[in-house]
Amino acid sequence: SFVNPRKVPQMADAEAVLQALGAPPSGVHFIGLVLNHRGFERAVAAGCNEIGMAVVASDSFNRRNQGGSTDESIAAWLDLAGKAEQAGIRAQVTVSTAFGCPFEGEITVERVVEVARRVAEARPFEIALADTIGAGVPTQVTEIVSRVREAVPGIPLRCHFHNTRNTGFANAFAALHAGVRTLDASLGGIGGCPFAPGATGNIATEDLLYQ
């Protein structure tokens, strides 16, 4: 994550991690999470061959997480996606709080679809739908994935779940049945957004593979 090291100090050594890994093997993508131009420049200089940006469906959360409105983040994404294309690297985007927000509560399906349509204007390699705080349930996953697939045909969807309420793996199963073919997970279920009160880790890679 190439985010502000003063706000997220545990990510301050992103360049050192990439340096230790060396060049990515053929077919492997080192993805750098960026939120602005500075992060993009750092990620490219460090050797990332794919960048990902987050745009939050909840304006309140976007302001706390990224210091600006959702509209501002969408504008930044469209610009950075163009720069990534010029640099010859892939770009993908995550629609965060797609299943609920700790500050605004429920996020309507219409809002998620609206944000997905707007970020799709840059023709990203992939759009992710993130349950940032682990609030989603399988029926909600089915509805949101189906609606977004209809709204942005031709763009692959990825889903990102947390297991806050022990629904993360059921949500992953629902996403697969709804047509998603890529899921985020982390070893041991580590992770969690520092700006999301009460957030727990991602679904665990080893448990997802077992499922």
Regions found by a protein language model. Give the residues of each.
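Conserved anion-binding
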Residues: S58-Q66, T70-T132
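Catalytic alpha/beta core domains of metabolic enzymes, predominantly
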Residues: T132-Q211
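Non-cysteine beta-strand/loop elements that form the S-adenosyl-L-methionine
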Residues: N49-S58, Q92-S96, G179-L187
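Short amphipathic alpha-helices and their capping/turn segments at secondary-structure boundaries
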Residues: H37-G47, A76-Q86, R117, A172-A175
